[in-house]
From Swiss-Prot:
The lineage of its organism: Bacteria, Pseudomonadati, Pseudomonadota, Gammaproteobacteria, Alteromonadales. Feedback inhibited by histidine. Catalyzes the condensation of ATP and 5-phosphoribose 1-diphosphate to form N'-(5'-phosphoribosyl)-ATP (PR-ATP). Has a crucial role in the pathway because the rate of histidine biosynthesis seems to be controlled primarily by regulation of HisG enzymatic activity. SUPFAM superfamilies: GlnB-like, Periplasmic binding protein-like II. It catalyses: 1-(5-phospho-beta-D-ribosyl)-ATP + diphosphate = 5-phospho-alpha-D-ribose 1-diphosphate + ATP. Pfam families: HisG, HisG_C. It comes from Shewanella frigidimarina (strain NCIMB 400). It comes from the Bacteria. This is ATP phosphoribosyltransferase. GO terms for cellular component: cytoplasm. It is an enzyme of class 2 (transferase). Its main location: cytoplasm. It is found in: Cytoplasm. Pathway: Amino-acid biosynthesis; L-histidine biosynthesis; L-histidine from 5-phospho-alpha-D-ribose 1-diphosphate: step 1/9. Keywords: Amino-acid biosynthesis, ATP-binding, Cytoplasm, Glycosyltransferase, Histidine biosynthesis, Magnesium, Metal-binding, Nucleotide-binding, Transferase.
Amino acid sequence: MSQSKRLRIAIQKSGRLSKESQQLLKSCGVKFNVNEQRLIAHADNMPIDLLRVRDDDIPGLVMDGVVDLGIIGENVLEEEQIERQLAGKPAECTKLRELDFGSCRLSLAVPNEFEYKDANSLEGLRIATSYPNLLRRFMQEKGINYSDCMLKGSVEVAPRAGLSDGICDLVSTGATLEANGLYETEVIYRSMACIIQSNKTQSTEKQALINKILSRINGVIRARESKYILLHAPVETLDQIVALLPGAENPTVLPLNDDTNRVAIHVVSTEDLFWDTMEELTALGASSILVMPIEKMMG
């Protein structure tokens, strides 16, 4: 297949989304090997090329139509869209769906000794950040005057180094803030990884491949969120047992050989089956309870 007909997907070369982006595509049946010295990986079994680039380059590559799809954090996407709108550059793309990894929040944080009451406490402060556009939008909405200190990394050390009064940075667990003597004050943006598509017109062949990949991604994520549950149940408490199964739809009920008083139940559950629920099932006479992960789902 010619180069122009190959689907080009941009993913983060290294960082918090890189490994999970690669694993997601492999779970969708895309076979490829990554050479750390090369920026492009060619799929072995599909007309797909993976471009491994800096995360903040991905939105622009998609918006400019250089690549067809990109896997990126919503925070990076939003930051770049604002930047390009201000610069009068193309800033449009289509977000196909959120993914099930990369959860974080963009938050304001100040030193432990700082007395914070509300957002107005930030008036006149110098804030270090890698996300000046998202920070500016938040501060303008609140009517707060401030100055920013643009840093590309190690934002959390800025107050201790005397570069700023506070920071605006990504937070996952808060451990990094705590280690640097900071505490979180305001969440200004919540983010997940997402997959985006260029708005350029695609060939029928390439769009069909995009639809196939998206369908598989949907199936992979549904499978990750679901469990396959099997158990034996007394007929007399069947309705009560089915009602306890979280997220269950239309369970399969099968007779057991030589036992007219009990049945087998098979069900796909979209919620976790916790220990207390299993204990309630047991109290209703359920037995041989198995909870298994699902590798793939479709339909």
